[in-house]
Amino acid sequence: MFYHLIAPLKNKTPPLTYFSKERHLKGALVNIPLRNKTLLGVVLEEVSKPSFECLELEKTPYFLLPFQIELAIFIAQYYSANLSSVLSLFAPFKECDLVGLEKIEPTLNALSQTQTNALKELQKHPASLLFGDTGSGKTEIYMHAIAQTLEQKKSALLLVPEIALTPQMQQRLKKVFKENLGLWHSKLSQNQKKQFLEKLYSQEIKLVVGTRSALFLPLKELGLIIVDEEHDFSYKSQQSPMYNARDLCLYLSHKFPIQVILGSATPSLSSYQRFKDKALVRLKGRYTPTQKNIIFEKTERFITPKLLEALKQVIDKNEQAIIFVPTRANFKTLLCPNCYKSVQCPFCSVNMSLHLKTNKLMCHYCHFSSPIPKICNACQSEVLVGKRIGTMQVLKELESLLEGAKIAILDKDHTSTPKKLHNILNDFNAQKTNILIGTQMISKGHDYAKVSLAVVLGIDNIIKSNSYRALEEGVSLLYQIAGRSARQISGQVFIQSTETDLLENFLEDYEDFLQYELQERCELYPPFSRLCLLEFKHKNEEKAQQLSLEASQTLSLCLEKGVTLSNFKAPIEKIASSYRYLILLRSKNPLSLIKSVHAFLKTAPNIPCSVNMDPVDIF
């Protein structure tokens, strides 16, 4: 008999010991009896015979690959997450007959000398940062790196931050890698996922393009991971376990012979700081040089005469425009001009957004909706006005000003299914649409030859927010959106902001901004300090506060040297009827943070809290 430690899946029970007639089962998925049920579990390791009687496990044909087991254990430890819950993220492998596909010889565009030099430099390092201006040809470098990996009979993974990036990226890669390419994201149906995995098992799929969950796929002989748009916050999960896929890739490059390339035109400050002195490859300028004119307007009006004239010229020349708006819906909030009270969600301490299409107010946190009120609840005034314009309101105003213009919206409300997303992007690519209005989705890597005008509205709402990353997020967005214009033809960028003096300093070279921000960023925040955020919530505000106070007292006894603690009410104090209090831990040493949190969780297991290591924001 052989004894094995098993982590039950989708169950918070700690690992348990079972016996088997087989050994060397590490990573195997097995059926185990537990409390009159049969559960699926993962074998973690072989152990000595225990002093108590054990039940027998039943082996299945599925198993996790060694890198998956290693990664799962790291996630559980680093992010203070339940190991069984973490293991449930991973898709297992199954041995099967290999598909005898005809060998694909990729037909690639020749790289320029600059691109060739960049690729050679990237391949000198297990992990590196490709800092390439928009339009500089990063994707061509990616494809050559992937082709070389497949030639070595290894598999490759290309991570993209959002599903909105994948259709266009897929088309470019499909022409080159044909049947070796597979697409993975959360909107796939269960049947589509099953078909995908069967092709992965047979190694028909050797290159996966996917969002962050693709990192948990069983890619055999994984040799290369590319993280495109590495700066994007979408790589950070906001649900437990709150992992950052980009950072996990860097961990894999450290533990396994897997090359990792991070790519961005606007790299995150943390990545720039990490790589700037050792493995940063700078790719300046455009692959196809074009002229771009940047125009600032100091105004709080949205559709100004100057902007309207520019849009008319775009339509007259049969070209295209994109317009960035940070808010979906018609307006971010409904305000009473008499008493200055806004309409708030009854379950969250946030304003409700105005959606005229459905004639409702909606909370974008808990999704509560209600009819649009006719009077102010606070002072009974019959006048309510919308504030902070959204995508739908921009569409409404432009349709009245640009008769006959074909305008579409790219935001969460309009891309609820993959088909809707594809239709919007394909119509714009086929020039069936003149103007595309969108939220941050519009900034993410789209490449359209006929876009000659990029418009940035409402950027002040981002750069003036309370986040310590506010300026970084705002300037990065400016660069990304400006990069959608004049990729193959000359064009213009309209930026409406009252902070033109500040922003004008950084529009020549994003590296100028990174160096400025490194000097300005307080020592209390990343990349100079590491953060861990603990959240305590309860339907009763006093109990939520009491939980955080009890936790603070316990934590103060558990803190490692160099770790500081602050306790405060969350900036958004209520979400979905639960009041929220936060504890923020800081340290220059991440290991000290992890040890402090582990000690607290062990000392106070009955104090419920969520742990967010390396939070991208504090809200």
Curated annotation (Swiss-Prot):
Residues 119-285 form the Helicase ATP-binding domain. GO terms for molecular function: 3'-5' DNA helicase activity; ATP binding; ATP hydrolysis activity; DNA binding; zinc ion binding. SUPFAM superfamilies: P-loop containing nucleoside triphosphate hydrolases. Its EC number is 5.6.2.4. Zn(2+) 1 binds at C336, C339, C376, C379. Coiled coil: none annotated. It holds the Pfam family PriA_C. Zn(2+) 2 binds at C345, C348, C363, C366. One of its GO terms (biological process) is DNA recombination. Its cofactor is Zn(2+). PANTHER family: PRIMOSOMAL PROTEIN N (PTHR30580:SF0). Component of the replication restart primosome. Initiates the restart of stalled replication forks, which reloads the replicative helicase on sites other than the origin of replication. Recognizes and binds to abandoned replication forks and remodels them to uncover a helicase loading site. Promotes assembly of the primosome at these replication forks. This is Replication restart protein PriA. It comes from Helicobacter pylori (strain J99 / ATCC 700824) (Campylobacter pylori J99). The lineage of its organism: Bacteria, Pseudomonadati, Campylobacterota, Epsilonproteobacteria, Campylobacterales.
